[in-house]
């Protein structure tokens, strides 16, 4: 989207015939002059830009998979990302091992921090994304996405080491971990580890 400023007597007529000229091409145009012009009536340019970028029949969300648990979450996240990659999707992965785009490693330190994970969501080439998180990241930073298509819970994390975040006992953990289920879209699904009784109990939600 660019803004083109031109001087013309009549914009409906060819420029050459009336000596019109382009004054400026702006890669980041302001919308205020169109929404609140000094003269003339306002134009819904924001709506027109959004309609151009997102057609009515287009899907505004990419498939997002969230993974949380006590152990095996990193391996699970990498496996899911690989399966999505095999489907031909340009897949972003945020895990304890780093930040990945397809088979390329963008960051070889933990990519679970909110800002690191956001790098995937703002990347226009990403067609699917997998996010590994921990109870600590969930409590301190929240999830880097608002909703997901699939939420995976591999095990019920322990409360040990979370006292600074007001988690004193293991009994509080289901209320923390169920967040991964609560953000699943209505047309999505939660995947619970049936070998973990505490995780299975989350099915009631």
Which residues make up each language-model segment?
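ATP-dependent carboxylate activation and anion-phosphoryl transfer catalytic cores
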Residues: 1-68
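Residue-level signal for inorganic ion chemistry
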Residues: 5, 94, 132, 191
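Walker A (P-loop) phosphate-binding motif
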Residues: 56-102
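Acidic, Mg2+-coordinating active-site environments of NTP-dependent enzymes
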Residues: 61, 146, 150-205
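Structural motif
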Residues: 66, 130-132, 152-154
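Short amphipathic alpha-helices and their capping/turn segments at secondary-structure boundaries
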Residues: 79-86, 135-146
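Hydrophobic anchor at the start of a short beta-strand
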Residues: 90-92, 128, 190
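Conserved nucleotide-sensing/catalytic segment adjacent to the nucleotide-binding pocket
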Residues: 104-141
